[in-house]
């Protein structure tokens, strides 16, 4: 925005005010409507398909996604994270896991996944960049005191996002065990509403499907969501030499009303710093 933009806005505002005094205000254009069911069905030969009615979950997902994309101005930021140090630390921690007795015999007390460490890194980053740990409301900005990280979990017929509350205060082992428990109960649709409603941000990971990078839709009232791609060996240039490193691409979607581009970049840089120096997640 420059001086000319401000002057034009002032002039336009004055002209608009004068016009609205002279006549009725212009009506807001109607939102475009999707194709009707009849219009869609006419495109296909009768008998060439089966019409499966939507269940309540699919209807809710559709409504929430339309709401998110039509009311939230999405802004996207992407960068690569080297994860060799993270993978080494994960192996070291898993190898050191104490054994505990279970119904099926002895088993490790925890088994960390890369996604568990991503959840913790996102929580750490939000604590380092607290202005990005926010939610937009028309009356003001909600500044959250803790990082409640939602994690997208695919379930039969849809998607749900259980939330790791106060992930900034929890250890990696607690996050890991909590996520495993909620993921199992999510797939059997046994989560309590308070376990998937709310939250301050979310993580969506499609790396297990080999997806390199993608962008995710923000889940209101969140102002951010992190899309995580697959970790893979890639050539990198370090000190003028080509080397091979394990690299993971991440894309941060932000609600531009709450998190401007520079603030989102600061948050993503803090996430990258934590992922590439993972010992910081242990203190």
Stretch-by-stretch model annotation:
Residues 5-283:
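C-terminal catalytic/motor cores of large multi-domain enzyme assemblies
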């Amino acid at each position: 925005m420059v001086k000319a933009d401000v002057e034009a806005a002032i002039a336009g505002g004055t002209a608009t005010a004068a016009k609205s005094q002279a006549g009725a205000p212009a009506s807001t254009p109607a939102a475009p409507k999707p194709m009707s069911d009849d219009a869609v069905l006419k495109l296909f030969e009768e008998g060439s398909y089966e019409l499966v009615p939507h269940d309540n979950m699919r209807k809710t997902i559709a409504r929430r996604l339309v709401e998110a994309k039509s009311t939230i101005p999405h802004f996207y930021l992407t960068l690569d994270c080297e994860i060799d140090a993270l993978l080494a630390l994960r192996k070291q921690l898993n190898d050191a896991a104490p054994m505990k007795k279970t119904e099926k015999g002895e088993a490790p007390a925890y088994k960390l996944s890369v996604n568990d460490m991503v959840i913790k890194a996102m929580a750490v980053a939000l604590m380092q960049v607290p202005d990005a740990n926010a939610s937009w409301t028309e009356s003001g900005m909600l500044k959250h005191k803790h990082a409640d990280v939602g994690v997208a979990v695919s379930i039969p017929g849809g998607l749900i996002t259980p939330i790791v509350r106060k992930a900034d205060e929890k250890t990696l082992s607690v996050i890991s065990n909590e996520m495993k428990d909620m993921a199992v109960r999510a797939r059997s649709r046994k989560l309590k509403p308070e376990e998937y409603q709310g939250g301050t941000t979310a993580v969506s990971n499609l790396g297990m499907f080999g997806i390199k990078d993608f962008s995710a839709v923000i889940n209101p009232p969140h102002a951010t969501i992190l899309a995580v791609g697959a970790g893979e060996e890639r050539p990198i240039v370090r000190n003028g030499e080509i080397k091979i490193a394990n690299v993971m691409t991440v894309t941060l979607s932000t609600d531009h009303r709450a998190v401007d581009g520079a603030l989102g970049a600061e948050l993503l840089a803090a996430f990258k710093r934590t992922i590439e120096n993972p010992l910081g997640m242990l203190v």
